[in-house]
Amino acid sequence: MFGNRMLVYWRDQALPAYLATAERWKAADPATQPDEHLLAGMRELALADARYWFACALMIARAKVTDALLGRFLTMAAPGRSLTSGMFLRGFPSPTVDAETELEALAGQVRGSDELRALVTTTPAPNLPEALEGTSAGQAWLDAFSRYLERYGHQVYNLDFVAPTQADDALPVLLSLKAMVQQPKGDPRARQRAIVAERDARAVETARSFDPLRRWLFRLLLGWAQRFGPDRERALFYMGAGWPTLRRLALELGRRLVDGGSLVEQEDVFFLETSEIEAAIAARAIGKARPDLARQARERRELREARKRLHAPPVVPPDHRLRFGPFDMSVWETQRRNEPDGAVLRGFAVSPGRVSAPASVIRSPDDFLEMEPGTILVCSTTTPAWTPLFSQARGLVTDVGGVLAHGSIVAREYGIPAVLGTGTATTRIRSGQAILVDGDVGTVTLLDGTDEADAAQRSPEPEPKRHSFPSTKKVTIFAIVGAVVAAWWRCWRRS
């Protein structure tokens, strides 16, 4: 089957090639490399990551297609029951759960030591490494923490290598650790087993509620989605695996160019093009400087900061709906359209459950210290390096994202309700404001001092779905398509 070939390509070719490139340059000492070799390493690692991203895109595509088929089927075959594909795509083994389990073990070591517990609970997270270095027990714990970062610290805050990785900036991990020490939530594996039991029971109950035709199609689509969905997170875990090494090479080169007078800060090197870096290296080789490159880097840095204030619309023009011929393709959108005022924001229901709590609005990693344990995390979007914040959150709301976004997958594994793709959550919600997140229907209610019962009364029903012809007819068509695809699948497997 083509899907199997994509898996083999990712697992046996793309991933090993990427990791081999990253390991080869990781073994090189940046301080001893010539300037030209540092630039060559940066370029090779960036290209290797780009090639790996193509393999990731294949894994994402097959997960997204099978998820969309399951989600659309549930909408048509069980209208009004608020069934979402995310309810059935939970509890699978993943690097996210592995990382949380290891971090919980580290937190357990702290809880088991009076000395460490006192240090961790009384020291601000940014100062923890320095405080722990002052004791033998603390140093031993830091050694274990370093091994944790060696395995998981490559995770990125965004796809731009100008941003530090988790290994470069471990603040969110330390914040999560403090929360785990002060407010233990139990064994992540036990929570995962409970999620699996709930998921499987819901699948059995849902299958029983359908007639034979719908039951067959539900099981077919569920099998595809559950087979391909978990591969997405495994593939994405390695995105940015070369970034820590690339950054070390770049910062060493940047340091040399600062010494040579061509740059003002090490990080300026990230804002130069390849030809400009080559020119700076050539100038340094003959004892000259290129101060014009420092000005160029400063202007580009300022432009990058200015662009952070922009909010991209879901589609252009904004009132356009994604369509392919006669087919509505809005299932692929990553933002819902919401009115600029009103008490309810609509988004995508991606992780089931319902919770009300104050919000912590976190716009970037610079705001991580403002995350309050026991609140609902509200942000533009999340990437793997944001994962440690989930252990402190009771729910998740984002501006951008859908059922297969990183945040939705992690929220389901943490068992917290999530509504993604509201478009305007970070501008409509303020930190400390009470909100109600309904991950079953995809709404976020701004409570404004009202209690949850009042909010439930004024919270709207799920948005009605548009049906161009009866649901039974749609399900029949789905069954025909499913039969054709199943036959194609069997042919591929025999070939």
Name the predicted role of every residue range.
Residues 474-492:
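Hydrophobic alpha-helical topogenic segments used for membrane insertion/localization
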Residues 260, 490-495:
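Hydrophobic single-pass membrane-insertion segments
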Residues 468-474:
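Juxtamembrane/start-of-transmembrane alpha-helix segments at the extracytoplasmic/lumenal side
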Residues 317-374, 378-379, 384-387, 396-397:
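Mature hydrolase/peptidase catalytic cores and their serpin-fold inhibitory cores, especially
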Residues 360-366, 370, 374-375, 380-466, ...:
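Acidic, glycine-rich flexible loop/linker segments
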